[in-house]
Amino acid sequence: MESVEKNKHLIRHLKIQRSAYEKQSSTTAQDNVVLSIMANSTLTTLTLSSNEVGDNGAQVLSEALKTNSILTTLILKRNKIGSYGAQALSEALNINSTLTTLNLSSNSFGSYGAQALSEALKINSTLTTLNLRYNAIGDNGAQALSEALKTNSTLTTLMLSGNSIGDNGARALSKALKTSSTLVTLILNNNSIGDNGAQALAEALKINSTLTTLKLVRNSIENNGAQMLAEALKINSTLTTLNLEKTLIGDNGAQALAEALKINSTLTILNLDGNSIENKGARALAEALKTNSTLTTLHLHVNWIGENGAQAMAEALKINSALITLDLSNNRIECNGGQALCEALKTNSTLTFFNLEGNSIGDNGAQALSEALKINSTLTTLRLYNNSIGENGAQALSEVLKINLTVTILN
């Protein structure tokens, strides 16, 4: 820590690992370290993750933040900060006017801590990014934050994954989204949100005109929730990224989203990984891709689209001129599906990233791919791991790479 003290007027970014902070012999010594750092006149980013800062350390940081006018980013994840520590930091946010990013993920302050931070957000006018992942804030914490969002006019990114907010919390946040004009990114992964919560969010998306990114990974929104979100996408004109990975939407949900893609003209990234989508859902999405001209990234990793679904996707790729990234890994595509996709690559001129891992396309699929790569001049990344490709297939790919100069990454 001596070097930090000596150079404290030169350092702009500082990351203190657990060993450096915890080696201090007492709480007082640790507090002195923090105070010394915060007295720095150039430091803009401070990372103290996994240092067992606790409530006492958070209180020391809070006092320093009240007078510090330089620091813009503070990262305190995994620090055993409880509700008292969150309360202390909230008091600092009432006064501090320079901090723009605060990461408090994986602490333990619960709903009381979230409520304290929410009160601060009603006053604070500089914070733009707040990460509260995995803090057990529950629906009460989400409700408090939603009230703050109705007043706050600077926060643009809110991360609340792993907080068990449930449908009630999702409904509360949805109400805030109807009036918020600044929030652009909302991450609600792994929150026990069901179709009712998804429906509430969908209603908000019909009105909201600022949100560009919504992530609902590992929530049980299922078919009904997907249908509601799909209806919202037909109206919404600002959302560009929607992540519904592992949300149990199935074929029916995929079909509903496909219908939305025929109308929507703003969504660019759609993630449907791990949703038990079979060839029926894949065919629907493929039909949408024939007319959609804005989607650039589609993730369908770990679904069951099979040969028929792959063939439908291949037909879409012959027509579509917008898609840049396509992930069809682990989809039971096999040889025939692989060959169909390779035929499409001969005419497609936009796809640059293609993931076919874990599809058992075999030597015949690899040979078909090598023929496609003699013609295709846009693909730069191709992933083929775990495809039962033997010596003949590997040889064919090896030979074509002597000719093809655009593929730079081949797994």
What are these regions (language model features)?
Residues 1-411:
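Leucine-rich tandem repeat or coiled-coil scaffolds
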